[in-house]
């Protein structure tokens, strides 16, 4: 919708607070533009709703439930992520 003219295919976008509000809107827009969204949220139910909406726009999402204020949790969960092209630190 918002980023239709931007091609983000083969790019990975990490979005914190992706389950609600601005983070959610950014996640959907990035997915529409072709990015694979690495969505971080504290609640799995919010991530599941986001995943449904991203699939509606034919996007890809990697869901990660974690609290970014907990450094150990964040480090452990993101250790498997090899590349981040875009960061939305919400």
What name fits each language-model region?
Residues 1-12:
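Flexible N-terminal pre-Rossmann segment of NAD(P)-dependent oxidoreductases
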Residues 12, 17-21:
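Conserved glycine-rich cofactor-binding loop
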Residues 16, 84-90:
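Rossmann-fold scaffold of SDR-type NAD(P)-dependent oxidoreductases
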Residues 30:
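Aromatic pocket-lining residues of Rossmann-like dinucleotide-binding sites
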Residues 35-49:
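Conserved glycine-rich Rossmann-like NAD(P)H-binding loop of the short-chain dehydrogenase/reductase
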Residues 45, 64-77:
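The beta1-alpha1 cofactor-binding region of Rossmann-like NAD(H)/NADP(H)-dependent oxidoreductases
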């Amino acid at each position: 919708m918002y980023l239709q003219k931007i091609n983000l295919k083969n790019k990975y976008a990490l979005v914190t607070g992706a389950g609600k509000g601005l983070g959610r809107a950014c996640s959907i827009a990035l997915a529409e533009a072709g990015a694979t969204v690495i969505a971080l949220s504290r609640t799995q139910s919010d991530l599941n709703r986001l995943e449904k909406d991203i699939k509606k726009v034919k996007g890809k999402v990697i869901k990660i439930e974690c609290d970014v204020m907990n450094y150990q949790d964040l480090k452990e969960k993101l250790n498997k992520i090899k590349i981040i092209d875009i960061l939305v630190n919400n």
